[in-house]
Amino acid sequence: LSVGITEAFMEAVSQDKPYDLVDPATGRVVGQHSARAVFDAIVTSAWQTGEPGIIFLDRLNRDNVVPSQGEIESTNPCGEQPLLPYESCNLGSINLVNHLMKTPAGWVLDRAKLEKTIRTAVHFLDNVIEVNQYPLPEIDRMTRSTRKIGLGVMGFADMLLYLGIPYDSDEGVAMASQVMELVQTIGHQESQRLA
């Protein structure tokens, strides 16, 4: 679960002022509440239970690649995919362990295989958008118009174990950067090719 927070709310927290409770259907202010009390409750719960996460909506909207379609109002439940109203969440993961190759010197990441998998995954996720039967026409229309996908990885810690790289090392951080740079670069290239 993630809670959407605005810069105006955070300003009210820092100044210990109330913030407006706005009806999202009408845009009318229906009350006020202490921003600091709400923020303290959110932070306490996150510390005690791990929930909720916090999403900074103003920041997300500054990076909105399709502002003509509307403002980002929420994310999927875990917060990794910002969504416009009526967009659907289309996520996929690549298992990095399946992209290791044993050599006489030890295990190595097969970058060519990973690149091919990234390209295939982008096509697969785009095909999911195409063949999915959405429960509402608005979801169908919005999802097909923005064609938003999210491609991530799993098995990173296991991959590091095979490679003999400590998870908490500078080399581990560098490997994470290299892998995700490849996923992002190739993923964007393939998305542009599809467009």
Segments from the language model and where they lie:
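Catalytic-loop motifs flanking and including active-site residues across diverse enzymes
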Residues: 87-90, 149-155
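Active-site cavity-forming subdomains of large catalytic enzyme subunits
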Residues: 1-111, 134, 138, 187-195
